[in-house]
């Protein structure tokens, strides 16, 4: 069921109504810092935020449409009590088709990988809005353990633990370059 939902959303996101594809990235207008950020992105981020067009998209949407739990900390200031179990929470709810309930536990805490198109103009970041700036989000993905030392993951089950995720080892200059690249994905 959620594959069909993802496909419907993907079709909408590929439409010209949503994607003008007029960004500096699309026009090939990157300065040296942004180009460095693009290289870093290709190494550390493109596995989930694909730089290749998916299916029939005319340009890259910077998402694979998959679901992961990246271990975001709880946002106690969002006014929503309790944990947000994401896809697993929905599949375990009375609103979900009964056929999917048995796989719900494996999906706890998972959220769809968002497109990064226009990401610079869509704060706050994270499914729960825990990070106010793009830089804070990148710093979390660079070293999530540092954030967890203060505020652990909201849903500790099923955390995505691909080698390097949350421990990229980027320095401030690299983080600034990556953020600069992400800003080039904004339509003009």
Language-model features, listed with the residues they occupy:
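Short glycine/threonine-rich turn/loop motifs
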Residues: 25-132, 136-140, 147-152
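Post-cleavage N-terminal segment of exported redox proteins
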Residues: 1-39, 47-59, 160-188
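Active-site pocket scaffolds in enzymes
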Residues: 135-173
